[in-house]
Amino acid sequence: MEQEKQEAPVQGKKKRLSTPLLIFIILMAVTAVLCAIVAGIWLHGRSSLRNGGTAPTVTPGGTEQLDSYTVLHDGKYYRYKEHMVNLLLIGVDSDNKPAAPLPYGSDNQADVILVAALDTDANKMTLISVSRDTMCDIGVPDDTGEISGVAHTQLALSFSNGDGLYESCRLCREAVSQLFYGLQFDGCAAFYMGGIGRLNDAVGGVTVNVLDDYPFTNVPGGWNMYPGQNVTLTGQQARLYIQARRGDATGNEDRMQRQKQYMLALIGQAKARVASSPASVLPLYNAVSDYVLTDLDLGKLTYLATQAAGMSFSGDMLRVTGQAALGDGNRVELTVDQEALYDLIL
């Protein structure tokens, strides 16, 4: 991800962007165009993002930290790439972005968690999907926002422990950072999932081949969503398709497959619409702008907007793997394969 092996990389075919990242880039691009950013802001954004010192600070047993940028792991040397930008992208299980901070401990959870690693030298981007059910240590704040303890629980709850806005993003960001051996993030963006329906309809609907893992036809609005059927989803159906899940040990894993399928289809539809009519970027922006929260300033947004246009993926979207089981209260708990996670980070 943000470290490199001391050997030539293998090139793969390009992959399309994920839904939260597409939304994020649409916002960045429109912001840059509408604000007519001058070169000085672009240079400031580049400087602040490319000098963040984002290398992981913790190493597992059997790994030797040789210096701030180099580790020896399983007999191979890995060196941190200095021009990486690491972003955390969060899909929030909420209809709307709160107009003001909520009391700590609100019910908004992080349903989608993605780590985006941008190599600004190689113009390559890597996405890593982290299950909401991942068991990890998260900070527990008191009524004033001060951290009063630590709980080992689902990653999704890190967001709900906060205020539904920036403090929730911070708590989720810190939990993922600790999970990823101290990896630091240059920015965070949250998308409130109530905007999925509006975005879906703004691109003219999204067609998927319905996967056979959930009884959609038994749910209001899912009358035509039969397994194996090609269906152009309405906004209501799109949200149902990417949010509904069974309550068993594999329910979230199956839902993540549907989310990935929908993301790819949505991106194809959005790209086709923008290619045929560049002005359609503005309606897409208007459709989702009220549902996005980010801590990136204008300079960083502008720099990322210009960089993202030429970036591609190498390989599939990666996933943090582990063993899922039902825990207390029939809650799904995913115990991470720590060795596989560190190999993934490398």
Model-derived regions, located:
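Non-catalytic, solvent-exposed segments at the cell envelope interface
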Residues: 2-17, 21-28, 34-346
